[in-house]
Amino acid sequence: MKAVLIPGDGIGREIAESVRAVSAALNTGIEWQECEAGAEYAEVSGELIAPGTLDAIEACGWALKGPTATPIGKGFRSINVQLRQRFATYANLRPVHTLSGVPTRFENVDLVIVRENTEDLYKGIEYMLTDDIANGVKLITRPACEKICRFAFDYARKNGRKKVTAVHKANIMKLTDGLFLRTFREVAEDYPDIEANDCIIDALCMKLVQRPEQFDVLVAPNLYGDIISDLCAGLVGGLGFAPSANIGDKTRIYEAVHGSAPDIAGQDKANPSAILMAFAMMLNDLGMTDKADKLNAAIQAQVAEGKVITADIGGTAGTKEFTQAVIARL
């Protein structure tokens, strides 16, 4: 089968090579079509996303993407957001769990974040009323709320999860977050076998850093989902172990949660675990469950051993050396 591989910016090309090497070692049979998108591509072409990239994703329906840079406070819109909206990948799935060998404050984190991926403040509707007043629109619709909440409950049921928690700020944003919460409660009635509750976003952040084990599946509007994803990654050792999947009806785009890390780009220092774990998510969805399990087990065993590991978790190994060590375990 064919799948699109987008290296992206910064460390993207290095960790994309890790994916290629692992894919070959697992004999997945995937034929990678490398396509361009990102700030580095824009510097030479004047375009953020190559025209052929969109066509390739649409044709394949499957893509694995490296990190892409986004300027802060000015410049172009996030490429991630553009791709999610272009291909209607309405659900962003981000599993978070403790790995043996990674120094953290917690030993029993095992939760999943389900983030609405297409609207909220990330819709990008903002403008200047005057030189001194900026306005942004928080767009929340019932169809999108129902779709993401139903996805969360379906995921919980399929994967043996027992509880789904809605994340909101409906005590203040009574119309927008209120609509999300009301829709969540309506959908929950169709899943009597799954416990449903809700938590205000600021209280949730406190509870996550106190007792993360009390949570199972978290479903959230776009902005809150983005924020708690990084928070939860911090609970298990950082963004180096945070994969994600952008899921639509016709298209799936997998990626690491972390950024392009330009400060270490080209130095063979990046931890490829997150994108390899995202690749494992892709393999699982493709029906290659045994290969996905082997890859996850190899990563976990390599990290747990604590010898050939990257600098972000206290080691000295480079990207290539760590990748080869994982491959040796396959």
Where are these regions (language model features)?
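Glycine-rich phosphate/diphosphate-binding loop of Rossmann-like nucleotide-binding domains
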Residues: V4-L26, T130-D202, Q214
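Glycine-rich phosphate/pyrophosphate-binding loop and the adjoining helix
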Residues: P51, G124-L129, I133-A166, A170-K174, ...
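Short glycine-rich or small-residue beta-strand-to-loop segments that form or flank ligand, phosphate
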Residues: K2-G8, A63-P67, V164-A170, A278-N284
